[in-house]
């Protein structure tokens, strides 16, 4: 598969992507099973535990929900939001007991012969794991979907998406994350926002993300771990498209090359968005500025400012950057006449707004003038 991708000319990349779309029949079958699982998780999950609780909602994430699946391979997240989790600490300390209940429910579904796909729950799971993993596969087809089921604190409640969340949500997250000493443990709480961030993007961009993910899987097969998380490359692709012009129709090879060139410049990456949070709230602003001063690469989760998706994994980035540099010489980045594809002009960092010292200086001058004026009258 690697030989096939790197050998085709740049003009054929769109056709290559079409070949690697999931089959419609399996996708429809998968959607039906996911809907059944969501209903079961919503109505029956944790009702028979020692302390029965209500599931407020079930969020769907992963590539199967984002529309960026690969043929024969996909991943999905089912986030079970529980009413009994009233803070981040509850999610951290009590998720094990509820994940056991979820596992029991999945075993019941596994025994149901009316479901047209095979469910395989990973036996190596332990209560300390953040998620329960299982696989769905079609017996008559070489296709599977990897799932993670995660119990979570319903932080956002019934926030109307795409409305920007109340910044106090993030202030509370930052405060509790700091007191618990846990880095990026609560990204599951923001699944719906993460999904919205990608879902409204044009189809062509999702196809480019699919191509980048396919390339990443080839690298993983060749290099093994450690590598940067796949989500970091998805965000990097969105960033490249945004800074490259936000076109609904574009040259796929140019977009692909831009992403790989950004990977080779990983030591310079400083990327964040202000779609869900920004610098207006003083506590959030202070925390954001600290996050953005961390050693690069920095790619903040657009839904969760505590999550640096680029992570502290310089070795993984170095290995992936080496592979990206090698790929830039391959035919998939050349036109039929041999001329190389030019990347988009995309900066490696997003500017950080300066703190409003000027306003404070004006206030100070105004205060001094008032003292001088009223001081003279008082003499």
Swiss-Prot record:
Gene Ontology CC, one term: cytosol
Extracellular side: 375-379
Membrane-crossing segments per the record: 356-374
InterPro entries assigned to the protein according to its UniProt record, in alphabetical order: 2-5-oligoAdlate_synth_1_dom2/C (IPR018952), NT_2-5OAS_ClassI-CCAase (IPR006116), NT_sf (IPR043519), Polymerase_NTP_transf_dom (IPR002934)
Keyword entries, A-Z: Antiviral defense, Endoplasmic reticulum, Immunity, Innate immunity, Membrane, RNA-binding, Transmembrane, Transmembrane helix
Primary residence: endoplasmic reticulum
Tissue specificity as recorded in UniProt: Highly expressed in the brain, liver, spleen and heart.
GO biological process, one term: antiviral innate immune response
Database matches in PANTHER family: 2-5 OLIGOADENYLATE SYNTHETASE, INACTIVE 2'-5'-OLIGOADENYLATE SYNTHASE 1B
Family: Belongs to the 2-5A synthase family.
Record note on quaternary structure: Interacts with OSBPL1A and ABCF3.
Described function: Does not have 2'-5'-OAS activity, but can bind double-stranded RNA. Displays antiviral activity against viruses via an alternative antiviral pathway independent of RNase L.
Protein name, entry field: Inactive 2'-5'-oligoadenylate synthase 1B
Organism of origin: Rattus norvegicus (Rat)
């Amino acid at each position: 598969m690697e030989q096939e991708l790197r050998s085709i000319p740049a003009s054929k990349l769109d056709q290559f992507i079409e070949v690697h779309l999931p089959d419609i029949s399996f996708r429809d079958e998968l959607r039906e099973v996911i809907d059944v699982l969501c209903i079961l998780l919503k109505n029956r999950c944790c009702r028979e535990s020692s302390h029965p609780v209500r599931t407020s909602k079930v969020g769907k994430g992963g590539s199967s929900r984002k529309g960026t699946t690969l043929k024969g391979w996909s991943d999905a997240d089912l986030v079970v939001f529980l009413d009994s989790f009233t803070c981040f600490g509850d999610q951290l300390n009590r998720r094990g007991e509820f994940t056991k209940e979820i596992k029991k429910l999945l075993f019941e579904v596994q025994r149901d012969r009316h479901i047209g796909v095979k469910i395989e729950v990973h036996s190596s799971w332990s209560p300390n794991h953040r998620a329960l993993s299982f696989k769905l596969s079609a017996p008559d087809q070489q296709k599977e979907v990897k799932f993670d089921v995660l119990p979570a604190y319903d932080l956002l409640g019934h926030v109307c998406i795409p409305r920007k969340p109340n910044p106090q949500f993030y202030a509370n997250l930052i405060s509790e994350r700091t007191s618990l000493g846990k880095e990026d443990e609560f990204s599951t709480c923001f699944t719906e926002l993460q999904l919205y961030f990608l879902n409204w993007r044009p189809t062509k961009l999702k196809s480019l993300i699919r191509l980048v993910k396919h390339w990443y899987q080839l690298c993983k097969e060749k290099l093994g771990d450690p590598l940067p998380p796949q989500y970091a490359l998805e965000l990097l692709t969105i960033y490249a498209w945004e800074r490259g012009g936000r076109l609904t129709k574009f040259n796929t090879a140019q977009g692909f090359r831009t992403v790989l060139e950004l990977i080779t410049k990983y030591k310079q990456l400083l990327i964040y968005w202000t779609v869900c949070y920004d610098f207006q709230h003083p506590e959030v602003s202070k925390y954001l500025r600290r996050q953005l001063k961390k050693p690069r690469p920095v790619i903040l989760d657009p839904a969760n400012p505590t999550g640096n998706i680029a992570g502290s994994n310089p070795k993984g980035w170095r290995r992936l950057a080496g592979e990206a540099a090698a790929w830039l010489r391959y035919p998939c980045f050349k036109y039929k006449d041999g001329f190389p594809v030019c990347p988009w002009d995309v900066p490696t960092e997003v500017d950080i707004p300066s703190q409003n010292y000027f306003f404070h200086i004006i206030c100070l001058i105004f205060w001094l003038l008032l003292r001088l004026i009223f001081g003279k009258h008082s003499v």
